[in-house]
Amino acid sequence: MRLLFLAVLRPHTGNAVTAQRVRAHLEAAGHVCVLKDAFDFESRSEIANLILAENCEAALALHLYRGGRLLQGHRIPFGVIFGGTDVNEDANQAEKNTVMGRVLEEARFAVAFTESMKEMAQAQWPHAKGKVYVQSQGIATTPNAAFNWNTFLQRSEINQSADNLHIFLLICGLRQVKDPLYLVDAFSAWHQEEPNVHLVIVGPEVDPVFTREVKAKVKRAAGVRLIGEMPQEDLHAVVKNCFAVVNSSVSEGMSAAILEAMDLEVPVLARNIPGNAAVVKHEVTGLLFSNPQEFVHLAKRLVSDPALEKEIVVNGREYVRMYHSWQVERDTYQQLIRKLEGSTED
């Protein structure tokens, strides 16, 4: 089949990585997948023209509101994949909620990353029961073997002997929902006690106004550095070399950065929110914190307790292999896409 796939494709963001992975799964099954950025289109008529021009027989959208609403009413079957903001944010706005409900009426299937996301969706839109499937994100990491860690440290202006360094890595697009400033004050105070600990924030400048605020704050914060977006393979190499990966988001669908850290055998400290608690079991596959002070307490514990670090790393890796298999994800999407075959009158 020729499929139109609409997603939010800001480079080096979780959505873009997910979309590229799903496209690869579908193309491996022999489908042609026309991947387009939902933000490039304003109206359904533009999508109608695109469907005609590309001769698309079916469609898929990552994000019900941003992508799915553009696929309605074209008389081609489509499926949707929930994004984190769909159920965590957009569903709380009456107008968007109604739009997403209509999208689900027309969609042949919907994919949620977690069981709790599925439950939230079915509570919001009871008519979607039976249409929502759970498929967690499949994880495959590809660290750049030629990546130079010392050059990265210099670029981050961290000039110390690399032996006793503890680099905590926060990977996120600079926007408010990711809350990159949540830990900055507490971390900076810790760095002043222990100068070998550093927090490096890596990610694209998504929200220009908020980015200015982040840059201004980080500039004044000892022990905290901000680095722009990086190619996926380089980012995986940075993760592999750092001491721990941190997530301080206000809400998450399913953080690929957390799962990739587990896959690369690096401990994870994550803010205790439903999306993170769905993948991080406290003191088993990672550590969960509820405030900046607790983060520092847990980070200090991790630094001083190699046995805890080892246990978390082993369990995290096992968890990803068991529940986030790339092959299982491939099989699921290749099966679901068959629901789009056949006429729209089925």
UniProtKB/Swiss-Prot annotation:
Single GO term (MF): glycosyltransferase activity
Subcellular location: Secreted
InterPro entries from the UniProt entry: Glyco_trans_1, Glycosyltransferase_G1
Signal peptide: 1-16
GO cellular component labels: cytosol; extracellular region
The keyword Transport belongs to this UniProt entry's keyword annotation: no
Transmembrane region(s): none
E.C. code: 2.4.-.-
UniProt keyword list: Glycosyltransferase, Secreted, Signal, Transferase
Coiled-coil segments on the chain, per record: none
PANTHER family the record matches: GLYCOSYLTRANSFERASE 1 DOMAIN-CONTAINING PROTEIN 1, PTHR46660
Protein family: Belongs to the glycosyltransferase group 1 family. Glycosyltransferase 4 subfamily.
Protein name: Glycosyltransferase 1 domain-containing protein 1
